[in-house]
Every structure is written in structure tokens, then in C-alpha cells.
Amino acid sequence: MINTLLEKPEYKIVKTRLGTWRSFGYVDGTSFHEFKSDATWMGLPLIHYTYGRSPETGRRVCAKGVIAIGRLACGIIAIGHASIGIVAVGQLAIGLLFGLGQLSTGIAAVAQMALGVYFGLGQFTTGYIAIGQFAYGKYVLAQFGFGEFVLSMTQRDREAIDFFKTFPVIKDFFH
């Protein structure tokens, strides 16, 4: 839905005390919505939310803000299908500190495929502490684990058992 006439689209603009909403409805019933807060921090809007395809370009708009929410999101806290931020939540979540999603990265990552530096929790996971079905790390708790100290179906390192017993949630599983 690209703007073939190269005309400026007629947005419905609503100003609230927190920011500005821009909306555009297409003839086929789809729509585009965007909210940007008036408050900013280091040049970024405090909240930026996007939904749908831009009537100007026909493409999705990347939400960029301190808190960014949209199909594509980039911010300190980013929430979207593909998100990049210090804290990222989404199907593809590239987080610096924390990632939560189907495929995520971060110092701590929780996902189906979690690539954590310090902590990873997921089906396929890495991290200094790795907990998952298939896991790789220094301290590993997994069905199939690889690493220095592993507690798995086939391996029971004493160091791994003692380490994981220090976590109250996990120690109850040991008899």
C-alpha cells in the first residue's frame, strides 16, 4: 500500500496531555496508528507506539523511544516482534541486559533459543548458568547438557548439584 499519488496522507491527529496520536484508515479496512509522547529523554520520546503500515511509504515504522512498542521496536525497553534494546521482549529480542522471546540474547536471556552471557533459560540455551533441554555453559542443568559442571540425564557432577541446590526454587527437586 505505497502512496502512489505521492500526496501527503490525511492523518487523523489527536493531541492528548501525554502526546500525539496519528491515525490513518485505508479503504480496505486496515489502519496505521502512531503515538509519540511529548516528554522526551535524550532526544527520544518517552513512549513511541506504532501499528500498521505507514501511508507515506507502505512500510512498517520502527518504534524508537525510551519505551518502544511496535512490530519493529528499538529503545531502552523495546517490545515488538523484532526488538532491540537494553531490555527487549519479542519473537526476536536482542537485549543488552535482558531478552525475552523465542530467540533472545542478553546478559540474561529467557527464550526457546536463549543466548545468555551470564544466565540462559530455554529449550536451547547458553550462559555461565544454563538451564534448558539442550544447554551449554559453566553450570548446566539440562536434559542434554554440555559444559564444565553438568547435571543432566547422563551426567551428575557433584559441583553442579551443590551449585543448583543453592537456589531455593531448584533445591526442592533434589531428594
Task: List the predicted regions and their residue ranges.
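Repetitive, compositionally biased segments used for assembly/scaffolding
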Residues: 2-175
